[in-house]
A protein has these predicted regions:
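Catalytic cores of RNA-modifying enzymes
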Residues: 1-149, 176, 196-211
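Short, surface-exposed acidic
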Residues: 136-137, 167-186
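Active-site-proximal catalytic alpha-helix in oxidoreductases
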Residues: 152-155
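Short helix-coil junctions and helix-kink-helix linkers
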Residues: 163-165
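Short alpha-helix boundary/capping motifs
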Residues: 186-187, 203
Length: 211
């Protein structure tokens, strides 16, 4: 299956692919990635524009439970964010979210000279190995909230962020229960740390009288 937003190119690629390709005229940002299930597994490749890459991958990796493998070309800056680890200046909400569902690997850099006309920036090709379903976040809704809240103020200490967070009043208690030092900053936490915080947050919300 091929997703193409432009009607002309969708028709052209359907013609070139003939019986081997099903071209679907749609915007990848509106596609229902939950259609990719273990009973309907997919391998996905794509060349993603800058404004599409982050929101599409946020949706894809969290909803496609049957994704076998993926490879994407993106702007180098986006690739660095996807593959970055704690302590890296590129590490942020997108890094934590995608790495909670898949293992990204930076494969190689593509220079402007590979394109015509050449862009002003480098591109990067990354591969992704989806994590087994039993290793994925139990409460992705809370994980998304935690990482968005934290990385909106990435230079502040976690204790300060938690005290001033009306969206997640349980965050201070969740940090304490997860054993996270409140003087740390978001970019110092691992993916596992953020998942632990979200799990303790879930426990606090589900059992408010016991915590």
């Amino acid at each position: 299956m091929l997703l193409e937003k432009d009607s002309h190119w969708a028709a052209e690629r359907q013609r070139l692919g003939a019986a081997r390709t099903q071209a679907v005229l749609t915007d990848a940002l509106r596609f229902d990635w939950s259609r990719i299930t273990p009973d309907n597994p997919w391998k996905i490749i794509g060349n993603l524009p800058y404004n599409v890459a982050s929101p599409m991958m946020w949706d894809l990796f969290s909803r496609a439970t049957g994704l076998v493998r993926a490879a994407f070309m993106v702007q180098k800056e986006v690739g660095q964010r996807l593959a970055a680890g704690p302590g890296n200046g590129h590490y942020g909400a997108l890094s934590v979210w995608v790495q909670s569902f898949a293992r990204p690997r930076m494969e190689f850099i593509v220079g402007p000279g590979a394109f015509s006309p050449p862009p002003k920036v480098d591109s990067a090709v990354l591969s992704f190995e989806p994590l087994p379903l039993d290793q994925r976040p139990e409460r992705p809704d809370l994980l998304a909230l935690v990482i968005k809240v934290c990385f909106q103020q990435r230079r502040k200490q976690l204790g300060s962020i938690a005290r001033r967070c009306p969206l997640a009043p349980w965050l201070s208690a969740a940090l304490e229960q997860a054993g996270i030092t409140p003087t740390l900053r978001p970019e110092q936490l691992t993916v596992a740390d953020f998942q632990h915080i979200s799990l303790f947050g879930a426990s606090l919300l589900d059992n408010p009288l016991k915590n």
